[in-house]
Amino acid sequence: MHHHHHHSSGLVPRGSGMKETAAAKFERQHMDSPDLGTDDDDKAMADIGSQARVVGGVNAEKGAWPWMVSLHWRGRHGCGASLIGRDWLLTAAHCVYGKNTHLQYWSAVLGLHAQSSMNSQEVQIRQVDRIIINKNYNRRTKEADIAMMHLQQPVNFTEWVLPVCLASEDQHFPAGRRCFIAGWGRDAEGGSLPDILQEAEVPLVDQDECQRLLPEYTFTSSMLCAGYPEGGVDSCQGDSGGPLMCLEDARWTLIGVTSFGVGCGRPERPGAYARVSAFTSWIAETRRSSFSDLD
């Protein structure tokens, strides 16, 4: 796969000549804005761990995607998630479905580069104290495959751990636009789990085309899909819940949450994602809803 090295510090392409640290850039860009059960097609890992990398990807540079989270269930990677604030993650509903009452089995691993280096000094591990699955989630149709996780303790923002911007309702990302996916999921359909975080570039696909190429599903306005007609680059089992992100005004913006697909990287079978912009008000309401009266 043709791939260009795109950035060193997470928020700005490397060619921009900026010497600012990611943390300083974060302060500048974000501090003024307000905190804004699985099935074959799901891209989560099965409990046995025999299911789970980005297909056609390359090793990410360390620190390239500081909002990337590895969600561990009973001590092993099961899904991805994105950090969207000091104590909130966005992931896929199917990752947490049926496991949302067993909070003690979950841990969120942030600042991670390789699964084998969990004890690296950049890594921050947090327990989860609340999981909220979107009430419109439908396991069969894959509608509203999105969930939020609240961390027991907020993370510390560092060069390695930073939140991603969320796509707003009015932002339009046209078909053909190249965006990035990342994850520790399988490197091929039925393939193995990588140690190092993988990333790949995929073009966004027109909504009608998504429906045509994924006729088994009703492709709604709260979904989007991405991939090459010839296949070969895609998210796969173990990538679910992770980010589909586009560089917009020098900021990485989360536009999709890895949701489902038919196989991985097959020609004419783009990967499907929950469309973040369709859920921005739900995300904001969930953040605001008081914490104490729900527990």
Name every feature range the model reports, one short phrase each.
Residues 1-85, 89-90, 111-112, 293-295:
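Protease-domain processing segments flanking chymotrypsin-fold serine proteases, especially trypsin-like
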Residues 60-64, 83, 100-102, 139-142, ...:
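Extracellular/periplasmic catalytic domains that process cell-envelope and extracellular macromolecules
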Residues 68-74, 177-295:
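Extracellular trypsin-like serine protease catalytic domains
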Residues 76-77, 95-97, 115, 138-140, ...:
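Solvent-exposed loop/turn segments at secondary-structure junctions
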Residues 89-92, 97-139, 200-203, 207-210:
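Conserved H-D interstitial segment of serine endopeptidase catalytic domains
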Residues 89-93, 143-168, 196, 291-292:
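Conserved active-site neighborhood of the chymotrypsin/trypsin-like protease fold
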